[in-house]
Amino acid sequence: MENLPEPLRVVAQELAKLPGLGPKSALRIALTMLKMPKEKVTGIGQSVIDLREKLCICEQCASITDTCPCRICSDPKREHDKLCLVSEWDSLLAIEEMGLYRGYYLVLGGLLSPLDGVTPQHLEFQKLEERLEKGEVKELILALGATVDAEATASYIKNMVESKYPGIELSRLAQGIPIGSEVKYTDKETLRQSLEYRQKL
């Protein structure tokens, strides 16, 4: 990239800092922007600035929002006794897009990972305890995934809820063999969970 004109090189280098974009892809995007009308490029730049300036973290659920509290937390028609715990905001979006769940959410901001130095203090566990202490939540739904870190986080939450809030029902998303898969190709852990959480017919 050293042979590129300075402004083009700088834009390509900045774009390459985004996850999933390598130097070549970043350069292609920069060249595409160079071909666009000035107003469109200015619009893209302004929208990126607005992204940082006009969004905030909801004080109740820790999701990304442009209003505080967010639209979900402000909705009185939601089921107050259900709280769905997700690791990141995009998980909340995925669940919300299905339109099946009508309770509230809390975004943890990640998963516990001792190897990476992520402890309960780095996540929204204090906010979780504040929500549970109010006494409105009757069911806590863990929608954290099926990774090793998700299992560690679920175990930590289970121990906390059982010791401090024994009246709260704890559930998690069902896990098992995906639709369209065959048993013989399923990994051992997925197969174990499928057997453990088997359903009656």
UniProtKB/Swiss-Prot annotation:
Coiled coil: none annotated. Keywords: DNA damage, DNA recombination, DNA repair, Metal-binding, Zinc, Zinc-finger. Residues 81-178 form the Toprim domain. The keyword Transcription does not apply. It comes from the Bacteria. GO terms for molecular function: DNA binding; zinc ion binding. A zinc finger (C4-type) spans 58-73. GO terms for biological process: DNA recombination; DNA repair. SUPFAM superfamilies: Recombination protein RecR. Belongs to the RecR family. May play a role in DNA repair. It seems to be involved in an RecBC-independent recombinational process of DNA repair. It may act with RecF and RecO. This is Recombination protein RecR. It comes from Maridesulfovibrio salexigens (strain ATCC 14822 / DSM 2638 / NCIMB 8403 / VKM B-1763).
